């Protein structure tokens, strides 16, 4: 009996200590580098035609910090895009495809998205909405079906997808987006293939809520918390079990609404549960400063004597301009 009481006291003390450790600033630092993991992080908060997604920029910025510090992924292996257009999303996913094509089975790919999701009312397909997209026109976004098809075709040893978005037509605050007409729509789950596992923040007809007190999406917060507590040495099975339990319980208590994270893997496979986020646990923790997420400002216009900076968008526009000129000169 005394042992049980002692165990309960120790467990309570441990929980109290961890409760004081901010996931944003108290980070496990791994001295072992992981040069074969490549990631694309997309954080869409400030929409042009839709409501903001609270804390989405913070979600992505801190997830990047955990990839670098706790999992040991070099910064050059990570593409982080704040408030991404559809062109930005496709451009960075294409980068990931090119890298994995070169690295083949040596590579592990990670894709993280925080922002609006949207269902097509007719087809019930789910879409990720870029900041220049319209909820009334889901095809202005990127369908999860197309995304999974692209990622599943990559020859990576593992492909992990984390989506802090919902596809019912509701916003992170819980009310409905313009196109949803006040009714939650249950979007179809797109099939996955290859060595891919998809973690989603909520079931098809649920809302992915924020955790206001922590300034994160509810799903992302507990994803980060498990990476923090495990110092990175956690299997996907352990991560899934923890995040699902914590999100479901917290959402009922805080939001009085259900939010149930889901995991989708190729049919008939369970070995993904043994995959590890980091091969070795980080051996030390560091207290870091808070990140103030910002959107990178556009570069000022170059002087007439200089060539303008070539961004993915300007490169694409230049290519299209050259193509159009060639077509005009050489009509079929």
Protein language model features and the residues they cover:
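Sec-dependent N-terminal signal peptides
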Residues: 4-13
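Cysteine endopeptidase catalytic domains of the caspase/legumain-like
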Residues: 7, 18-332
């Amino acid at each position: 009996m005394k042992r049980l009481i002692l165990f309960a006291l120790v467990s309570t003390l441990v929980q109290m200590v961890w409760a004081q450790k901010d996931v944003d600033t108290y980070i496990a630092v791994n001295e072992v580098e992981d040069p074969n993991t490549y990631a694309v992080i997309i954080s869409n908060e400030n929409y042009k035609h839709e409501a903001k997604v609270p804390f989405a920029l913070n979600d992505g910025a801190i997830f990047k910090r955990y990839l670098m510090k706790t999992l040991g992924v070099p910064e050059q292996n990570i593409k982080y895009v704040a408030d991404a257009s559809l062109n930005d999303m496709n451009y960075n996913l294409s980068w990931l495809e090119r890298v994995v094509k070169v690295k083949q089975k040596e590579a592990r790919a990670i894709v993280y998205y925080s922002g609006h999701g949207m269902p097509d009312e007719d087809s019930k397909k789910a879409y990720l909405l870029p900041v220049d997209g319209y909820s009334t026109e889901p095809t202005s976004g990127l369908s999860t079906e197309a995304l999974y098809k692209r990622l599943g075709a990559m020859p990576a040893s593992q492909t992990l997808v984390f989506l802090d978005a919902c596809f019912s037509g509701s916003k992170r605050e819980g009310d409905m987006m313009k196109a949803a007409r006040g009714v939650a729509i249950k979007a179809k789950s797109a099939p996955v293939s290859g060595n891919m596992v998809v973690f989603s923040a909520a079931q098809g007809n649920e809302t992915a809520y924020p955790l206001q007190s922590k300034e994160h999406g509810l799903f992302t917060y507990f994803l980060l918390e498990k990476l923090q507590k495990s110092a990175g040495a956690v299997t996907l099975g352990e991560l899934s079990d923890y995040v699902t339990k914590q999100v479901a319980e917290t959402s009922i208590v805080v939001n009085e609404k259900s939010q149930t994270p889901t995991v989708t893997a190729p049919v008939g496979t369970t070995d993904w549960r043994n995959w590890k986020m980091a091969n070795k646990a980080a051996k030390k923790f560091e207290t870091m400063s808070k990140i103030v997420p910002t959107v990178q400002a556009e570069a000022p216009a170059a002087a007439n004597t200089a060539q303008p900076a070539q961004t993915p968008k300007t490169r694409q526009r230049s290519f299209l301009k050259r193509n159009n000129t060639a077509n005009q000169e050489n009509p079929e």
